[in-house]
Amino acid sequence: FGPDGRLYFTLWRPSRGMSQLWTLQVNKNTQKMIEVKDILAKDQKKQNIDELLKLLGHTDRRIRQQAQFALVARGEIKALRILAMNRKAELLPRLHSLWGLGQLKYKDSDFLAVLCADDSDELRAQAARWAGELRFDPENRIPVMLRDPSPRVQLMAGIACGKLKSKNALGALEELIVSAKNKDPILRHAGVTGLVGAATLRELESFVGHP
């Protein structure tokens, strides 16, 4: 999809022949299409912080990402942190704030503690992902999330434990794999990925005869 609201596509051909470029669009420009086109064309260097934070909740992902990258370029850690922890805010702005902080390599144990206890399953999951990518978990909160009631959180926590090389997670990772019962390949993958990253070769060999 282009910023003008059109769908751009080509027809696939099995031969090496060239295909024409086609576009589809509604009969007339809608107000939403015009708005998206105008916002994407704006110079975000001239927009203030509040305007950019508001755009983190826009329905168009390109606009949300553009606002996120603009806030990251300005190093707006404080504004992003406040929004990410605000439980009254909508989910998308909070997620983009967290992702922006990840881009800035922001690390803070209190911040991680707040997000790990959030009511939103997806925010907890993304907090685990954030911790894993930054290799940051000074209080060993991520292994605990392997027993989170949300499978989505368990998935992200399992992968993160591997990146963190968390020895405290070995038992919980084993439980995660066993609980998957070869019926949930996604959770099994998370558990195996976690073990491969966190366990030594000798520790992995100890699982060979696991029932």
Regions found by a protein language model. Name each.
Residues 1-211:
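Extracellular/periplasmic ectodomains of large secreted or surface enzymes and adhesion receptors
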